[in-house]
A protein has these predicted regions:
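Conserved long alpha-helical elements within nucleotide-processing catalytic cores of c-di-GMP signaling
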Residues: 7-12, 20-42, 49-79, 85-89, ...
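Short hydrophobic/aromatic beta-strand micro-patches
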Residues: 95-97, 138
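Catalytic-core segments of nucleotide cyclases and related cyclic-nucleotide turnover enzymes
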Residues: 56, 102, 106-107, 124-126, ...
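Catalytic core regions of nucleotide second-messenger enzymes
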Residues: 86-87, 116-133, 162
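Juxtamembrane or sensor-core-proximal signal-transducing alpha helices
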Residues: 1-7
Length: 173
């Protein structure tokens, strides 16, 4: 029991219960290597919108509550298609896998954003706020790509969308 608890603590973020980024990279890399011909997967880097102002206004307790609520949306996605992790601070990542077409990845990512859009969090007795995140999407293509290339491409797409607007995702070009 103790060994299992320690293993969990070494691989999961203590605040959100999501995988730590290091574990995510390991598991996502395994998923990419195991993919069969004709399969595609997507890597999504996510950054919470307006998190700094929430943390400044409602303190660390409010910020932590916001992070946990966002993580609960990530955890609500079907695990046979989603691998989720907290990268650091207000940055998260997920892998959408087990898909035959890019359109399936888009379907699952759009579903995630729909669930997120419908989620509000009560930050004080009189104030609730929708949870919002910007995302960058990269997917496996015709070229053999490593998990590190996919993460880098998803990061580039994230920075692109953050420059333009908030609350949605864009694909790596």
């Amino acid at each position: 029991m103790e060994k299992r608890r320690m293993q969990y603590e070494n691989t999961h973020d203590p605040l959100t219960g999501l995988y730590q980024y290091k574990q995510f990279k390991r598991l996502a890399g395994e998923n990419v290597r195991k993919m069969s011909a004709g399969e595609v997967c997507g890597i999504v880097m996510l950054d919470l919108d307006s998190f700094k102002s929430i943390n400044d206004t409602f303190g660390h307790n409010g910020g932590d509550k916001y992070l946990r609520e966002f993580a609960s949306v990530m955890k609500s996605m079907p695990s046979e298609y989603f691998l989720t992790a907290r990268r650091s601070g207000d940055e998260f990542c997920m892998m959408i896998f087990g898909c035959k077409k890019k359109e399936e990845i888009i379907y699952w990512l759009d579903l995630f954003y729909k669930v997120l859009e419908d989620r509000k969090i009560l930050l004080s007795e009189t104030y609730s706020q929708k949870i919002s995140a910007s995302g960058g999407l990269a997917w496996t293509g015709d070229n053999e790509e490593s998990i590190y290339e996919l993460l880098s491409h998803a990061d580039e797409a994230l920075y692109e969308v953050k420059r333009e607007s908030k609350g949605h995702y864009t694909e790596y070009q």
